[in-house]
A protein has these predicted regions:
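Short, well-structured N-terminal submotif of metal-dependent ribonuclease cores
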Residues: 1-36, 51-60, 127-128
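Histidine- and aromatic-rich ligand-binding microenvironments
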Residues: 5-6, 36-37, 93-97, 118, ...
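A general structural signal for well-ordered alpha-helical segments in protein cores
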Residues: 21-24, 41, 62, 81, ...
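Residue-level detector of anion-binding/catalytic polar loops
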Residues: 33, 113, 131
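Active-site-proximal, substrate-binding regions of enzyme catalytic domains
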Residues: 43-89
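Active-site neighborhoods of divalent-metal-dependent phosphate/nucleic-acid chemistry enzymes
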Residues: 71-120
Length: 135
C-alpha cells in the first residue's frame, strides 16, 4: 500500500533508543510503496541533532533519503504550498503547524494515507477526511 510518512516516523525509525523505534521501523519496512515529502528531509536536518545525532550522521541520513530507491520523494513546490495554505485557511487551522499541514495536505491531495505518531495531527486529519494509518 502507498503511504506517506510524517517526519516523526522517520525520526523514530532513525533513532534506535526512541520510544517508538520498533513500531516506526516495522511500519517503514513493511510499506510496499513508501513516500516522504521533501519537507521531512529538511526537518530531519534540525530535529536529529536535538537527539544528539552528529552532523556527519545527519548528512548521511539526508543523502540516504535523497538517493533512496526505497522511498519516493514528493518534492515541495510553490503550488503545493499555495494549496496547503488555502487548505489551512478554509479549515480554520493554525499556520503555527504549517509544516504538518503541508505534509498532511500532500497525503490528502495524493489520496494516500498519512502515517504519523502525532496524535493531535492524527485526530485532526481524521476529522478533516484525511486518511491516516492507525499506529
Amino acid at each position: 500500500m502507498k503511504v506517506l510518512f510524517d517526519t516523526n516516523v522517520l525520526v523514530y525509525d532513525t533513532i534506535e533508543n526512541s520510544p517508538h523505534h520498533d513500531s516506526a521501523s516495522e511500519l517503514v519496512d513493511k510499506s510496499a510503496d513508501p513516500m516522504i515529502n521533501s519537507l521531512s528531509i529538511v526537518e530531519l536536518g534540525f530535529v536529529l541533532p536535538r537527539y544528539g545525532i552528529d552532523n556527519e550522521s545527519v548528512r548521511m541520513k539526508i543523502d540516504e533519503l535523497l538517493h533512496s530507491d526505497y522511498f519516493t520523494v514528493s518534492w515541495l513546490s510553490g503550488k503545493m504550498m499555495e494549496k496547503a495554505s488555502t487548505f489551512v485557511v478554509e479549515n480554520k487551522l493554525s499556520f503555527r503547524d504549517f509544516n504538518d499541514w503541508i505534509i498532511a495536505y500532500d497525503a490528502y491531495s495524493r489520496k494516500v494515507p498519512l502515517a504519523t505518531f502525532d496524535r493531535v495531527l492524527h485526530n485532526k486529519c481524521k476529522k478533516l477526511g484525511i486518511q491516516v494509518i492507525e499506529i
